[in-house]
Every structure is written in C-alpha cells, then in structure tokens.
C-alpha cells in the first residue's frame, strides 16, 4: 500500500538529484534577469573644429543619448570659450585685450584674469621661462595672428626690439578685475594654457550632464575621466 510519505529511494539519493537541478534553475533565472537589467555600454565619438585645430570627445555611457544634441551643445560651449581665449578672432576678449594699446587701467574677462594670475605664478615658478607676454616675438616669427608669412629669419635687432615688449612684470593686476599694461603694446599668447583651460571647462560640462567615463582631446591636449572601455583606463596613443 502506497502513501504520499513512502518512497523507494533513500533521501540522500534524492538530494543528489534535486539540488543540482534547483541550483541550475536559480542560476539561469538570475542570469536572464541580469542581462535584462544591465544595458550595454555605448561609445559616442564626437568630432569638430575649434581654436584653429580639431577636437575629439569620446563618451562611454549605458544611457541612450541624442548624438546630434551632444554635438550641438558641446560645439556651442566651445564657441563661447573661443570667443574668450582666441588670439586670432577679432571678436574675442583676448584679441581685444591685445590690441588695446593703452597704459590706462581697464577691465578684462574673469576667465582671462584667471589665466593671467596662473601665468604669473608659473612665471615665478619657472624663473621666467613660462611667459605668455611672448606674443610680439611669436608674431615676429610669423606664427601669430598678424598674417605675416616669413621667408627670412628675423634680425637680431628685430628680436631684441620685440623682447622689450615682453615680461609678466609689465602687466599689473589691479582691483575689481582691472589690469594695467605698463607697456601699452604688451600682448598675451595663451597657446600654452588656453586649450587646457577649455578642456577643463568641457569636462565640467560633461560631469554636470552625468558622464563619468570620457576622454576629451583638443589639438593634442588630453584629459580623461573614468576607466575607459575595458575598465583598465583609457589607452592613449602617441605619434
């Protein structure tokens, strides 16, 4: 006579059969759930031109983004920053500073003032080697915004004359965002620091949008955040 409580197999034998089966079922269930709940990380690669050079931004995120909107918004921010730091554009804050031939106090853009203060500190730390007032010499050699293409090397007299217009001590920081050129023809060339500042501003923008894994490159200058695509950091190639 058979009852629900009788069994022809010993309990240990049944456990050997059912435990692996149940474990496999649970594993499959969890795996399927994880695959649904964890979207694939997507790479967005944006490119453009600014500051007389090219830029590339790589974004890694699990969220779906409108690539056209990202391109547009980043491009607009770069345009805003270029209108501050470019020494080539006549409508930029830096260009207007450079061609204000005066020794009277005048106000400058807060971002320009930040770079001036940083440049003064760097100038002291490097014993004068870092000097953005080198702009007249850069122009003399044909690498500035003056549009001169040189076919000959500048003379010693020309170089020495240009050097008389340089020196961070010839730019005085006053109060309330005011500065004064002790030499009216003094000019600034922030090629060594403006791109880095702009990259920092773009990174702040990306972080504010919620991105945590990205690489920003402008004209060869790079900043990266996060662990890259494989979780081991961003791989940078040098040419």
Go through each PLM region and give its residues:
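Tryptophan (W) side chains
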Residues: 2-5
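Mature catalytic core of soluble alpha/beta enzymes
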Residues: 12-239
């Amino acid at each position: 006579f058979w009852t629900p409580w009788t069994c022809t197999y010993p309990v240990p034998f049944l456990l050997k059969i059912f435990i692996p089966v149940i474990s496999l079922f649970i594993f499959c269930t969890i795996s399927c759930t994880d695959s649904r709940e964890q979207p694939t990380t997507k790479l967005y690669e944006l490119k453009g031109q600014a500051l007389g050079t090219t830029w590339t931004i790589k974004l890694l995120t699990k969220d779906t983004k409108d690539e056209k909107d990202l391109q547009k918004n980043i491009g607009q921010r770069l345009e805003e920053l270029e209108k501050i730091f470019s020494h080539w554009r006549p409508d930029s804050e830096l260009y207007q500073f450079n061609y204000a031939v005066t020794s009277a106090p005048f106000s400058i853009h807060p971002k320009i003032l930040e770079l001036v203060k940083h440049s003064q500190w760097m100038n002291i730390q490097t014993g004068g080697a870092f000097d953005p007032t080198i702009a007249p010499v850069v122009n003399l050699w044909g690498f500035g915004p003056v549009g001169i293409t040189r076919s000959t090397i500048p003379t010693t007299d020309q170089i020495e004359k240009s050097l008389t217009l340089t020196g961070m001590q010839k730019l005085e920081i006053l109060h309330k965002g005011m500065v004064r050129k002790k030499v009216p023809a003094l000019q600034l060339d922030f090629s060594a620091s403006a791109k880095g500042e702009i990259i920092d501003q773009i990174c702040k923008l990306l972080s504010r949008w919620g991105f945590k894994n990205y690489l920003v490159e402008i004209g060869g200058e790079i900043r990266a955040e996060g662990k890259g695509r494989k979780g081991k950091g961003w791989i940078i190639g040098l040419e």
